Amino acid sequence: MAYFPLFVDLEGRQVLVVGGGKIAMRRVRTLLEFGCEITVVSPEVCEELREKVLWKKKRYDETDLESLGNVGEASRFIFVLAATAPEVNEKIVCDCRKKKIPVNNASNRDQC
């Protein structure tokens, strides 16, 4: 599969990160530089994440995508990052694709 680099203005956009470990922290650190509003969904998160994001202390389910708003509005581009167990990532990728939400699976380049 060939990948096309994409530049997106993320300032003020909602970003959902699923997972609260080291991979999620690296992604969040980078995204914060671009002015995103970040929500993390995970039963546990590293302490540094707690201070920088809105944390939903729970396991992911499909309603987490619905809570982000209407993805059809051009002004509310939503980019979802998945950084957890492979089976959870697979579900998130499927859920996002059904709803036409751009998704990046940090652990599987084929699902970007």
Protein language model regions, located:
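Structural motif
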Residues: Q14, I78-F79
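N-terminal ligand-binding/catalytic initiation module
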Residues: T30-E33, V41, A74-I78, K99
